Structures are given as C-alpha cells and as structure tokens.
Design a protein with these regions (language model features):
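Transmembrane alpha-helical segments that form the functional core of multipass membrane systems
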Residues: 272, 278-426
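Hydrophobic alpha-helical transmembrane segments of membrane transport and translocation systems
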Residues: 394-396, 400-490
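Short polybasic/polar patches that bind polyanions
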Residues: 174, 215, 360, 387, ...
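Membrane-embedded alpha-helical signal segments
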Residues: 1-317, 321, 327, 449-490
C-alpha cells in the first residue's frame, strides 16, 4: 500500500481508505467525503456529547431500530467525565455490555458494515470505530412458498432476509455440528452468503471447493442472487439446460438435505436456497414424498417421474406415429387425426409451444383480479376457436394441454424448461428425419442428461449410472424414516 497522507492509504485494489485516528474531526472529514453525505439523504450522522467528549454516530435511515438506538443514547447521557475509559475496547465493555458490538480500525470494513445497516460510533480520543448492530431490514412475513407447496407439512418458507432464513434452518437442526459460514461476494453489492452444512457429514473437499470459488468470484454484484452465484461457481457447460443445483424455498427441505450431507447456500435478498450437489433424482424429489406414508410417497414419486418423462416424449412420439401410421397398432388407431391438417403437425406443435409460453408470461404479468378472465379467454375462447378456424387439430390441442399440465408436476422451473428444450429438439429432428430423427433426438437428449455432472464431479443420474442397486431402490421407492446418518452418495 502507498501512503497518501499520514492516515489515508491506497489499497492493493486501487481504492483509498483510512486508518482511524484519535481526532474525531479528521475521521468525520474523511468519512463525510467517502460516504457523500451531502448527496445521500439516507446516510445520517449525528454529533453528540458523551460526558465531556465529542462523538459522532453514523447510521442508515430505515436500517436501524429506533427504540434500540434510543436506549443506547439514553444510557450515554448518564456517563460522567470521570467515568470515561481510556480506550474504545474498555468503553464498549463498560457501557455497551449487550448486543453485537465490534471495533474497527480502518474505513474499508466500517463502510461495508455501515451500508449493510450497522450503526457506527466515533468518540474523540479513540482511534477505533465502535460498531453497534441494532439493524432491521424491511421484510415480509414468513409464509408458504407460492411454488413449493405441499399437501401436508409445514407452511413456512424462506424470505428475502438472510438471518431469518438461517434461523428457520437452525430451528429444525439444534445441533452444534450445524455450521453456517458467512461469506461475501460482489465488489459493489458485498452480498452476504451463508454456506450451511453438517460438520462430519458433508464432503470436506467439496466444502473447500465451494468456499474457494465463492471467495474468488470476480463480479460487481449478485444482481440475480442464486442464479448469478451459480453461474460464477459453476461456469462450465452453460449450453446444457439441465440444472446443476436444486432450488427450494422450503426450510424443511433444506434442513433435510443438510442432514443428508448436502450443502445449502443461502444468499441475502433471495427467498431460495441452493442445494448441492444435486442429481436429477434430487431435483425431482419433493417434500410430499416424506409427509405421506411410504406407499403413498412412493406412488407420488413414481407418478412424478413418469409424468415428467411423458412431458418430454409424448408429442414427439405422437408426431412420429402420425408420420408413420403403419406403425400404429390396431388398439391405438384412435390416436389418428380425425380431421385433415391445414398446417403441418410439427408447426402446430411448435406454435403451441411458444403460444403456451406466451400465455404463461401473460399470466405472470396479469393483475390477480384479471387472472380468471385471462384463463377463460386462453383456455376456452382461443382453444375452441383455434380448432374451429382450422389452425389446429383437436388432437394437437389435447396432447399439448397434457404436456403443459405435466410441466407443473414437479417444482423445478429449470428442469421443466430443460425438458421443454429437449422436446422441441426431438420434434424438429422427427419432422426432418422421420424415425431416424426421432431416435437421434432421444439419444441426444439422454446424452445431455448422462454426460452432465454435479458440482462434486459425480454422475448426474447416479445411482443409475454407475449402477448402484441399493441406492437406486431408495431413489424410486420411499423407505421408512428415519434415514441413516451420512451423505446421500452424490
């Protein structure tokens, strides 16, 4: 570092910072300039007197609990001049005995903490800053996630405040071996990231690998939270649409994954937890499998797997059979077209693929009061008149309706869109190359799954490849609870 003046320095990153002095005016002059207090209306500083010493309190308007701060300031009013300690550490022990109190000697960490909501107190004669954590964030209440709903089980879900989310997990795992490491990423955002795992159960090499990748992330801000972080810590194979991580907004699912030896990453400002390593079986698995008896849970799991597979293969298989009607057995003759086609089947299917996505986007951006009218217009008016006008055949509408509903049989949007992309590829290959295109499209789709890898470097479809019969049985059949200690083999 290069000295600029006795108390201002240049960091290795090229930014100026200050080592605090025992002169309050010098500290305030530097900080007021660095924080642009003349322009930032929400950066507040108050000059006060503690006994016979001048002091200054910095805080962010909207991030501070007014009642907590008021109690602290009221306590300062009773301090006498003879009772002032000689150093900041003694002052914090004597007059700030409760709460999270820290001491900082330079402006780098102090500014980051201040902008995250921590109040900072400077006292003339002390060369350190006292940080007082009495912050509060604007937050919504804990409620059931809109996407990860269950038929039975807890109704709480993660919110956008990191400490609330860690508390929801800690409430379920009251074990000192539950480790929650705090990391930061983003040169401008300094986003807090919590890495949660069970000591002795999670893979130590994987923990170190993830920690190192997060610490070495070179990004200005995690503007998209988990997705931004995922792309940073797993930069390879972006062209493969199958998700490398499982995302969940349920604390019970996250806690169960931690107990199985997985690692859960929570990002501040995001209500989703990133669970890793995750195979395709982990992503398809849902909480309902364990909130019902083993037989019911097994049925739900197998149904979800079958429906997800059908959502990818149904329309390409039907298109292939329509192009080769001689392959249709007698008992399946009813699947043939009842009316002639005005538009080739492959174009009907592709148009409906994009039309359904358009309706989905419209539903997301439609006010709640208009959602029902939109559904009526889309489902009845457009569907019925599209068939009557000759744009689409009724069979095409039927099979695409099934595929649309089947996409919602599992909770992962990422997996749903990955299967959609594979379905479109198989459709196009089938339309161009007929049976051989159908076979090639299926081979390509399954290669995209087979050659995918988790962040731990293991097979994406373990225990199917490599084959492990006991683990494969657990993936398809829901066994009795509780599970044995240890990881899940990913």
């Amino acid at each position: 570092m290069v000295d600029i003046c006795p108390f201002v320095h240049l960091s290795a990153e090229g930014s100026f910072f200050m080592y605090f002095t025992d002169q309050l005016e010098e500290n305030m002059a530097w900080l007021n300039q660095a924080l642009h207090v003349d322009k930032n209306f929400d950066v507040v500083y108050r000059v006060l007197t503690i006994a016979d010493k001048k002091a200054c309190l910095y805080f962010i308007d909207g991030f501070t609990k007014d009642d907590s701060l008021l109690k602290i300031l009221q306590g300062f009013s009773s301090i006498k001049a003879d009772d002032i300690p000689e150093d900041a550490h003694s002052f914090s022990k004597k007059y700030l005995p409760y709460g999270e109190i820290g001491l900082l000697s330079d402006s780098r960490e102090m500014i980051i903490q201040l902008l995250s909501g921590v109040s900072c107190l400077f006292i003339d004669g002390y060369n350190k800053c006292l940080t007082i954590d009495c912050r509060t964030y604007p937050a919504r209440g804990v409620s059931e996630p809109e996407k990860d709903k269950v038929m039975r089980g807890s109704r709480d879900g993660f919110v956008e405040t990191l400490v609330f989310n860690t508390a929801l997990i800690r409430r379920r795992i009251r074990d000192p071996k539950l480790i929650m490491e705090i990391l930061t990423a983003g040169e401008s955002s300094h986003t807090d990231i919590a890495m949660c795992y069970m000591e002795g159960r999670a893979d130590k090499k994987l923990i170190e690998k993830i920690r190192k990748r997060i610490q070495t992330v070179e990004v200005d801000a995690l503007s998209m939270n988990q997705e931004s972080l995922a792309e940073c810590i797993f930069p390879g194979k972006w062209f493969n649409p199958f998700p490398k991580f499982k995302f969940s907004e349920r604390p019970d699912t996250s806690a169960a994954s931690i107990l199985e030896g997985n690692i859960v990453i929570l990002v501040d400002n995001s209500p989703s937890a990133m669970i890793l390593p995750s195979s395709v079986f982990d992503i398809i698995e849902e909480a309902d499998d364990y909130y019902f008896p083993p037989v019911t849970g097994t049925y739900l799991r197998l149904s979800r797997m079958l429906i997800s597979l059908l959502s990818m293969l149904l329309t390409p298989t039907w298109l292939m059979l329509m192009q080769n009607t001689e392959l249709i057995p007698y008992w399946l003759r009813f699947i043939q077209l009842s009316d002639p086609c005005n538009i080739p089947l492959v174009w009907q299917l592709l148009i409906l693929e994009f039309a359904i996505d358009g309706l989905r986007l419209a539903a997301v951006n439609t006010p709640n009061m208009l959602t029902t009218p939109l559904s009526v217009i889309a489902g009845i008016v457009l569907g019925e008149y599209a068939v009557e006008s000759g744009w689409f055949n009724s069979e095409t509408m039927l099979y695409m309706a099934f595929v649309t509903i089947a996409n919602y049989s599992q909770a992962s949007f990422e997996l749903g869109y990955a299967m959609k992309f594979m379905r479109i590829i198989i459709l196009v290959c089938t339309a161009v190359f007929n049976i051989w295109g159908f076979i090639a499209g299926i081979i390509f789709s399954f290669c995209a799954i087979i050659f995918n890898r988790t962040i731990a470097g293991k097979s994406y479809i373990y225990p199917l490849i490599p084959l492990h019969l006991n683990e494969l049985k657990k993936r398809f059949l829901r066994g009795r609870l509780p599970h044995k200690l240890g990881n899940n083999g990913n």
